[in-house]
Curated annotation (Swiss-Prot):
It is found in: Plastid, Chloroplast thylakoid membrane. Keywords: Chloroplast, Membrane, Photosynthesis, Photosystem II, Plastid, Thylakoid. Belongs to the PsbP family. The keyword Transcription regulation does not apply. The keyword Membrane applies. May be involved in the regulation of photosystem II. This is Putative oxygen-evolving enhancer protein 2. The gene is PSBP.
Amino acid sequence: GEAANVMGAPK
């Protein structure tokens, strides 16, 4: 899992 994914960062 990526921390950015938890933050909901735009891709």
